[in-house]
Regions:
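Alpha-helical scaffold segments that mediate packing/assembly in large oligomeric complexes
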Residues: 90-155
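Long, hydrophobic/aromatic-enriched structural stretches that serve as scaffold segments
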Residues: 53-98
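Short, catalytically relevant binding-site loops at active-site mouths
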Residues: 125-128, 176-180, 210-211
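N-terminal "assembly arms/tails" that initiate or stabilize quaternary assembly
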Residues: 1-68, 227-228, 233-243
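A generic local secondary-structure boundary/capping motif
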Residues: 71-73, 158-161, 233-234
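Sequence/fold signature of self-assembling virion shell proteins
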Residues: 40, 184-269
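Extended, solvent-exposed, turn-rich assembly/linker loops in the middle of proteins
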Residues: 132-194
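Long, hydrophobic, amphipathic alpha-helical segments used as structural scaffolds
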Residues: 34, 38, 115-122, 161-164, ...
């Protein structure tokens, strides 16, 4: 038995497999940060904090003593509860392949948005300084005309190179910005293809962010520490529903402030 208590749930192995598959597929669809940051772990549920390598001076216990305390980043535990219909679960054992796992997919989307939001936008309550908050590069708005996005991205790439940040580089676009780029043409040529010609990395759909980010993927600049990776646990059940949850523990460290350029959403005209 572990802290997920899955063996107590009235769910067959076949149904568990379907639920897990749908959840994993949804997470893969919505998670963007894990494609561009360094992933450390999963190190297990017992991991409570990671060291930053820094020290802070504290009051000494006596004369002639210098006291310092090591700085750590405590991991954040995120949990998203959801309920599944027991009839749908039991139908799987009878051969059904069309059970409705939408609540599980909704939970996966919610927790994926939360993780990406913490990494890119920050999560002060969890002690996480996001990339937008921590970048030392100027933050400028995206152009109001999507046809000018390539110029804005090219300028951001130039900013990174000028501060000594090597590539490869990737671009993450929020849902609205990505849709605008995918649909736009400049004199008949797709704007998305124009972006792909100037960016040596990926152009990534990142629906949890606002605006865009241009950053290096050379490694060593952004650390995502995972304790317990996304896991489904059991809470309780009734005659009609099974109450589950999707959970993870993590923290994020921005190691190089100049390694990213953040672009805010376009200013309405």
């Amino acid at each position: 038995m572990n802290n997920l208590h899955r063996e107590l749930a009235p769910i067959s192995d076949v149904a568990w497999a379907q639920i897990q598959e749908e959840t994993s597929r949804t997470l893969k669809r919505y998670l963007a940060a894990r494609r561009v940051v360094d992933l450390l772990g999963p190190s297990g549920v017992a991991l409570s904090a990671v060291g930053t390598g820094h020290l802070q001076t504290i009051a000494a216990p006596g004369d002639g003593i210098i006291a310092r305390q090591r700085e750590v980043k405590a991991l954040v535990e995120l949990r998203v509860p959801f309920e599944l219909d027991r009839q749908m679960i039991d139908d799987v054992e009878r051969g059904a392949n069309d059970s409705d796992w939408q609540p599980a997919k909704d939970a996966a989307k919610t927790i994926a948005f939360a993780e990406d939001g913490a990494i890119f936008e920050g999560y002060s309550a969890g002690g996480i300084r996001g990339i937008r908050q921590g970048t030392s590069n100027p933050i400028e708005p995206l152009p109001t005309d999507v046809r000018n996005y390539p110029d804005a991205i090219a300028h951001s790439l130039s900013v990174l190179r000028l501060v000594g940040v090597n590539g490869p580089y990737s671009v993450l676009l929020g849902a609205e910005a990505y849709t605008a780029v995918a649909e736009a043409r400049d004199y008949g040529y797709p704007v998305l293809e124009h972006l792909r010609r100037i960016v040596d990395g990926e152009i990534i759909w990142a629906p949890a962010i606002n605006g865009a980010f241009v950053l290096t993927t050379r490694g060593g600049d952004f650390d995502l520490h995972i304790g317990q990776d996304f896991s489904i646990g059991y809470s309780s059940h009734t005659d009609t529903v099974v109450r589950l949850y999707l959970q993870e523990t993590f923290t994020f460290l921005l190691l190089t402030a100049e390694a990213a350029v953040a672009l805010s959403p376009a200013t309405p005209t």
